[in-house]
Amino acid sequence: MDHATLAMILAIWFISFHFIKLLFSQQTTKLLPPGPKPLPIIGNILEVGKKPHRSFANLAKIHGPLISLRLGSVTTIVVSSADVAKEMFLKKDHPLSNRTIPNSVTAGDHHKLTMSWLPVSPKWRNFRKITAVHLLSPQRLDACQTFRHAKVQQLYEYVQECAQKGQAVDIGKAAFTTSLNLLSKLFFSVELAHHKSHTSQEFKELIWNIMEDIGKPNYADYFPILGCVDPSGIRRRLACSFDKLIAVFQGIICERLAPDSSTTTTTTTDDVLDVLLQLFKQNELTMGEINHLLVDIFDAGTDTTSSTFEWVMTELIRNPEMMEKAQEEIKQVLGKDKQIQESDIINLPYLQAIIKETLRLHPPTVFLLPRKADTDVELYGYIVPKDAQILVNLWAIGRDPNAWQNADIFSPERFIGCEIDVKGRDFGLLPFGAGRRICPGMNLAIRMLTLMLATLLQFFNWKLEGDISPKDLDMDEKFGIALQKTKPLKLIPIPRY
């Protein structure tokens, strides 16, 4: 066969292949959810913008609550309403439970070593069991109430000192330090930061870098063939951040395992690290899995909690009548001097409503971590094709006008007298997800948010630093897995008693 014949055969094959592919694509497109027309090669990448949650919410207003996009070569389905989320999690959770893996989280094989990114599998189920039984079980959380109250007491003392000096409190940083020390005490029996040290800010920046890089739009995700070259450098940056955080964990672990460590002889700290090391010795976990499990827990348990707390205080400073109402409720239940106990939370419905309303408008994660269709799945009358990426836009669902009256207005009263909760059963409010992938740290996060908020409202009034009017407060946000305020909230505490 001469070269000309071979070239002709190859050309015919190439044209035929792409013609058939085009026909198949056109037939399949008719079954896909509606969406904006993609451009050649890049698809709908230009529609993403710097704040994808807002861009996709605007597209949903045009095309409907379930839309399809082609981001480069990746078919992406976006869920933007409570009705679609309900059908997805109640009826289609199983075939839509696996993950699309962002190129960035392949750094250090993170996607192979942690529960968040593993596919549903025996290994994933084992990790889930370890987390539910050994790490964040209700029994362990109940047994560690003393830790939580001690960390909240430290927060109170720090704020009291700032009040005496007339200094403003960086609300997000203070909440981050409290959350970080709670987790480090629970897991390692040590504190990793102090309110007046630079260490807390360094940790906060490191954790935010991880959250931002994982959530950031990435050309290597739109065109997987580019993954090996990491065109935006995101994977390299994330690998560096992982290494820095793991180095902290390894320092603590090596000290615990040292032959002269008191915890290796007759005493025990009875903390989570002891449990993890016991599982390591029993070959149920590798050291790499322990390191990356800790990365996940400290990322999710510090940045998202502190960001949510900052948004709570932001909304209350903009709505002083709601802050006063919450303070009055706390006074009626606790009086002036009694510090809140977790058993008191049930008697503070308005405070709980404030937290729920904040989670509705400012969910801890903007999108649930991306899911992947194992097969063609019918959803809301359309076909989600095999291997498509599914994004659940929590930010849009929380503002779904079909699920919420005056959806853009901060109104805790909407939760008074109703049974809506955040445990994945009410599909207009899914801050921690739903189904088999629901966040295992949900109960700890809610307890800490409530304790911190009740304490800071019980003992202090608050005003903005400078001459800014609350209604002029900057509400701009930085996009990552979580949404942080672009400009940190700094408030001056004023003792109430």
Swiss-Prot record:
The chain crosses the membrane at residues 4-24. It is an enzyme of class 1 (oxidoreductase). InterPro entries: Cyt_P450, Cyt_P450_CS, Cyt_P450_E_grp-I, Cyt_P450_sf. It is found in: Membrane. Pathway: Pigment biosynthesis; betalain biosynthesis. Belongs to the cytochrome P450 family. PANTHER family: CYTOCHROME P450 76AD1-LIKE, CYTOCHROME P450, FAMILY 76, SUBFAMILY C, POLYPEPTIDE 5-RELATED. Converts L-DOPA to cyclo-DOPA in the betalain pathway. Provides the cyclo-DOPA moiety of all red betacyanins. This is Cytochrome P450 76AD1. It comes from Beta vulgaris. The gene is CYP76AD1.
